[in-house]
Design a protein with these regions (language model features):
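Conserved class I S-adenosyl-L-methionine
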Residues: 1-31
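Class I SAM-dependent methyltransferase "Motif I" SAM/SAH-binding loop
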Residues: 37-39
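Conserved SAM/SAH-binding loop-helix junction
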Residues: 42
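Class I SAM-dependent methyltransferase SAM/SAH-binding core
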Residues: 45-96
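A short acidic, Gly/Pro-enriched loop at the edge of an enzyme's catalytic core
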Residues: 95-105
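A short glycine-rich, Lys/Arg-flanked "PGG" loop and its adjoining helix->strand segment in the class I
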Residues: 123-135
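SAM-dependent methyltransferase
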Residues: 140-215
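C-terminal lobe and adjacent flexible extensions of AdoMet/dcAdoMet transferase-like proteins
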Residues: 208-250
Length: 250
């Protein structure tokens, strides 16, 4: 398993608060579902286990390869649902893809749309998404309008790290800061590994989220042919920030 897959699983894979929402939308609008920013399959595999067909798109081929393996015949939870493949994987950039089919529902979980490089990146994605939806199809996008800001100093007040062990190596991902600037938010984590021999590595990882409100996303959607069709929320928990989910109709 690659380092990219391990870190993605540790930092993103256990989040489950939004899964019921995506299942509910799939039940309402039908499948196949286009999952944008699918990663290693947190949402796509959950939908497949519920019996929905999913096309999972992510720009990172290592993550997509891991998802492909997890969705294959070796995954008995999915095989029991259907003898046909329920998950199709695509390695592509959300700002520039052409799948040759249309979907009744496209979902963008976990603030993926805020990773696209600002208004131009979002516009490119929205044009792609619009072309891939059937008439009346729905695009559901999770965003974070605000985040609680903090910075860990000398370990004081640090959130608990996410820790896993793979092949004897301990991986720890420690959130150490959420900062804001004019463009958005910067999320900083400290990644640490310790081998069975005691060898230790430490590196910092930064993720930038573009600043985005539900109202602005609805305006940008209207400029690309969408109609605002409501909003819902994923509540915050003690460990995770909540999300505003914007519903756009093609």
């Amino acid at each position: 398993m690659s380092r990219a897959v391990i870190w993605h699983d540790i930092e993103c894979g256990i989040y489950a608060e939004d899964l019921a929402l995506w299942r509910s939308l799939a039940a309402e609008h039908g499948d196949p579902v286009l999952d944008v920013g699918a990663g290693t399959g947190r949402v796509a595999l959950d939908l497949a286990r519920a019996g929905y067909r999913v096309t999972a798109l992510d720009r990172d081929p290592e993550l997509i390869d891991a998802l492909e393996a997890r969705a294959s015949g070796r995954n008995s939870e999915i095989v029991r649902v259907s003898s046909q493949a329920l998950v199709t994987t695509v390695a592509a950039d959300a700002r520039d893809f052409d799948l040759g089919e249309r979907f009744p529902l496209a979902i963008v979980p976990m603030q993926t749309i805020q990773l696209l490089g600002g208004p131009d990146g979002r516009a490119a994605f929205l044009h792609c998404a619009r072309r891939h939806l059937v008439p009346g199809g729905v695009l559901a996008v999770a965003i974070a309008e605000v985040l609680e800001l903090y910075e860990v100093v000398d370990g004081f007040g640090a959130p608990l790290p996410d820790v896993r062990e793979y092949d004897g190596v301990v991986y720890s991902s420690q959130p150490i800061a959420v900062r804001a600037d004019r463009e958005g938010f910067v999320l900083e984590r400290r990644r640490e590994t310790v081998t069975p021999a005691g060898e230790r590595t430490v590196e910092d990882d930064l993720i930038r989220l573009d600043r985005l409100t539900a109202t602005r996303l609805e305006r940008e959607g209207a400029a690309t042919g969408f109609t605002a069709a409501g909003r819902t929320t994923v509540p915050a928990t003690t460990d995770y920030s909540g999300s505003e989910v914007v519903i756009l109709r093609a």
